[in-house]
Amino acid sequence: MKNAVGIDIPAEIKGIGKLKPFDGSRYSGWINNAPFISERHKESVKIVKDLITAVERSGLRNGMTISFHHHFRNGDFIINMVLEVLARMGFRDLVLAASSLAEIHAPVIGHIKSGLIRRIETSGMRGELATAISNGLMDLPVLFRSHGDRGRAIAEGDLKIDVAFLGVPSSDPYGNANGYSRDGDNSSACGSMGYAKVDAQHAKQVVLITDHLVSFPNTPFGIPQSQVDLIVKVDRIGDPKGIISGATRFTKNPRELLIAKMAARVIKASGYMEDGFSFQTGSGGAALAVTRYLREYMLEENIKANFALGGITGQIVAMHEEGLIKKILDVQSFDLQAVESLKNNRFHQQIDAAYYASSGIEGAAVNQLDVVVLSALEIDTGF
């Protein structure tokens, strides 16, 4: 079958199932907006003593699909922690549906070899795991989706999650959770819970893993208690310092800075950079560096942006606080300044991945953008 740009897409992949090529339409006609709510007895308690108990109560079985978010990026402790427990419990043939996998997740290689993980669906992969996969580690191909299309696939049921294991920096005993806390301890704050929000809404079972339990109600919350089944308290869920790594680093590389400066000049000359415009700068040293040059042009021309979208950095926050950007829509906080801003700034709003960029809805935030700057390892010139 051919997709909207004429590229042949297999109709079916053995072990994965039937595929539907993108036909150019932003609206597929079916979105399951209702969260999955399991039946609950009045006497049941959400907090359990450990991960083993949570797994047992979740109903997880061999062959099911488990999901995770990557808001801690290379500082994430949850995926390795949960997979180690599942390996000790003897599970096999699971589908790993993480929103992304980083260098810290190299232990997944061993879990693939042992048979714990049969297949992977994700939006990104780095480090030793990516190299091993590229060299033929798995029998079945990895299914990569964009962050927005992962949100669409979950909402529409193309990606059915049996149990979501979601690390949250704060939660109350009922499961109102967020990426920061207003009750003091922010040692594991990660900011926006944009990727986790979709999993929480649609997974059959949601297990929150936190290192900071607070009193009810934990407001504001990114994940409401109505979407949470079980809660486990652990010593640490992640290291926020790992958020700034790899693609989200601040560059001093002269070549990347030159690329950024040239990109900003193109934007200025495009005619789109006018008062009230909107923009997104993605991950990658050069892409993130564009922001500083846009700021200079905006000050020169007395231009203010209506909103900035996407992975949010301290540079975007500074421009917001300076009055150059009116509002921020945040699906992922790229540094600790962005984390702090989400907690303190009224017009810094966290959004979920489907709201951000789903191809299955007409009103996705990306459709409102005037300017987007993204990075790539390779770009063709003769597609």
Give, region by region, the residue ranges found by the protein language model:
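Conserved alpha/beta enzyme-core scaffold
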Residues: M1-G382
